[in-house]
A protein has these predicted regions:
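Extreme N-terminal starter segment of soluble prokaryotic enzymes
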Residues: 1-3
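Active-site neighborhood of phospho(di)ester-bond hydrolases with catalytic His/Asp-centered motifs
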Residues: 5-7, 22-27, 64-71, 97-99, ...
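Core catalytic region of metal-dependent phosphoesterases/phosphodiesterases
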Residues: 6-107
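Active-site-proximal segments of metal-dependent phosphoesterases and phosphodiesterases across multiple
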Residues: 29, 33-49, 147-188
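Short hydrophobic patches on amphipathic alpha-helices
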Residues: 57, 141-144, 184
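Binuclear metal-dependent phosphoesterase catalytic core
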Residues: 102-110, 179-187, 191, 198-235
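Binuclear metal-dependent hydrolase catalytic cores centered on His/Asp/Glu-rich metal-binding motifs
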Residues: 111-150, 169-178
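A short secondary-structure junction signal
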Residues: 126-131, 155, 160-167, 204-205, ...
Length: 235
């Protein structure tokens, strides 16, 4: 199965190469829609999503399209904007997942279905959407079922794709989630897809499990990375 994954678009809608499964791992929405619009206006975001993102998704060749939210996606948290409507699902084949799973058919219809679980949360930082304390995240991640194929999380696990530079302290910090790392060790998915930390883009590995940070923008919110293409063998 060919997977194309991206996160942290912040309003950018890059070209999507041909694939079987498209995964959007949060922060799809921009924060502001003009000089007189309030930052983090969830209803403006929802209108923008319906007007802009849905046609972009409908234009891709992906047979399956999955999305979870990120900390900039206020529409996902404030508007109860969770499951897709039948009319929109018919035109985009989109599933929006919030701490829930789904299955997708293998690329050629042979072999078993692939299981996917997606979660939008991040560690607390300033006042953003979809944030929980580590003690709460431990309970959230405990619901992830064992032996899934693909785990999608907006935030990265601790030590993998999570490095940031603290200008004030003059040091590199790891800001990923220890609780997510513990869940990965318990669940042992075939692959992990995440984002959130723009400078963490790339492929990593923990205990033989590939971890992809698929952010497409850099720390200055410039579009610098292409969507990540992952070939996952059918089983």
């Amino acid at each position: 199965m060919r997977i194309v994954a991206l996160s942290d678009q912040h309003g950018f809608l890059p070209d999507i190469p041909p694939c079987d499964l498209l995964i959007v791992a949060g922060d799809v929405c921009p924060d502001r829609f003009g000089p007189f619009m309030a930052v983090h206006d969830p209803y403006q975001q929802q209108a923008w999503f319906d007007r802009t993102v849905r046609p972009w998704l409908a234009a891709t060749s992906a047979r399956h399209k999955l999305l979870t939210w990120g900390n900039h996606d206020w529409c996902g948290q404030m508007c109860s904007f969770r499951s897709d409507t039948p009319a929109h699902a018919q035109s985009t084949d989109l599933q929006i997942l919030v701490d829930e799973g789904t299955t997708v058919a293998s690329a050629r219809g042979a072999g078993r279905e692939l299981s996917v679980w997606a979660t939008p949360w991040s560690n607390p930082f300033m006042r953003w959407a979809f944030m929980k304390r580590p003690s709460d995240l431990e309970r959230v991640y405990a619901a992830i079922p064992a032996a899934i194929d693909i785990l999608v999380s907006h935030q990265p696990p601790l030590y993998y794709g999570d490095r940031t530079f603290d200008l004030d302290a003059g040091r590199v910090d790891h800001v990923g989630s220890r609780e997510l790392l513990d869940a990965i060790e318990r669940v042992r998915p075939r692959i992990v897809i995440c984002g959130h930390v723009h400078g963490g883009f790339g492929r990593y590995e923990h205990q033989g499990i590939p971890i992809y940070n698929v952010s497409v923008v850099d720390e200055a919110y410039r579009l610098v990375n292409a969507p990540t293409v992952i070939e996952l063998p059918d089983v």
